[in-house]
Amino acid sequence: MQIRRRPPSVAVNVQELQYQVKTPENEPRNILEKIVWFKETEVEQMRDSVSLLDLRKQVANCEPPLSFLDALKHGKTQPALIAEVKKASPSKGVLRENFDPVAIAQAYEAAGASCLSVLTDAEFFQGSFDYLQQIRAAVSLPLLCKEFVIYPYQIYLARSRGADAVLLIAAILSDQDLTYFLKIIKSLGMTALVEVHTLPELERVMDIPGIELIGINNRDLETFTVDLEVTCQLLAQQGTSLQDQDILVVSESGLHTSADLAQVKQAGAGAVLIGESLVKETGNASTHSETEQMQAKISALFS
């Protein structure tokens, strides 16, 4: 399904009230479309607060980004681990009430993660660009800004807050947008993680020059259902071509056990992105430190 952008508003004003008739054309058809439509309004408001010109000035004063891709290629674990700082999701609600993003990030680093992913969407995932900035000041690992990017503004915002890599979701971007955004990301010295869910999406992005890192999301963002076979099936179809193009593949979502990791590693994934199973508190949270808990979880996953 093609994810649409928000159609122009056709509203009727009656005195001080405004009405709009709901039709299939002006209502989002799924969760992903709802998020994208919200982002359009959100970014407009962000621009009113801080201009793109001001953001670019901030970026010019940032330290050079770290190499996200190199960190994955030389990861401490196999497959390499991108550990995600994530408070909530539309499908599962709040994953952790006692949420300290910096403490979680530091525990991930101590437990052997190669890179970190930080949710920055506030409306649907209770994330924050402030979290990204705070984590950048606290850890030395490369950081991925996990965001629904539809405008260049968001890329510059991510870099200004310390991101070394940015997520680009193929389902919500045209080939033209992907190509343009990749050029911006490369010009900033950052890495793009281009995410796909279907074989047509994978084949489409493989034809776009300059892509070095592809994420296969086992979660359908239209329905939020998860199936690990997505990674296996796509790599069975295109794994050899991906290797020939020297593209590293990240398997994302639905990874909870060592058997899950073994399955996607066998399929050809060079890295995994894990959030929910690491962030959720365990029964012994009160007797073990954050780092001890994380080391135990990661050790169990990679055993």
From Swiss-Prot:
TM spans (from-to): none
EC number: 4.1.1.48
Keyword annotations from UniProtKB, A to Z: Amino-acid biosynthesis, Aromatic amino acid biosynthesis, Decarboxylase, Lyase, Tryptophan biosynthesis
GO terms classed as biological process: L-tryptophan biosynthetic process
Top-level division of the source organism's lineage: Bacteria
PROSITE patterns, per the entry: IGPS (PS00614)
Pfam family, one: IGPS
Pathway: Amino-acid biosynthesis; L-tryptophan biosynthesis; L-tryptophan from chorismate: step 4/5
Enzyme class label: lyase
Database matches in InterPro entries: Aldolase_TIM, Indole-3-glycerol_P_synth, Indole-3-glycerol_P_synth_dom, Indole-3-GlycerolPSynthase_CS, RibuloseP-bd_barrel
Alphabetized CDD domains for the sequence: IGPS
GO MF term list: indole-3-glycerol-phosphate synthase activity; phosphoribosylanthranilate isomerase activity
Catalysis: reaction(s): 1-(2-carboxyphenylamino)-1-deoxy-D-ribulose 5-phosphate + H(+) = (1S,2R)-1-C-(indol-3-yl)glycerol 3-phosphate + CO2 + H2O
PANTHER family from the UniProt entry: INDOLE-3-GLYCEROL-PHOSPHATE SYNTHASE (PTHR22854:SF2), TRYPTOPHAN BIOSYNTHESIS PROTEIN (PTHR22854)
NCBIfam families: PRK00278.1-4, PRK00278.2-4
Family recorded in the similarity comment: Belongs to the TrpC family.
Name recorded for this polypeptide: Indole-3-glycerol phosphate synthase
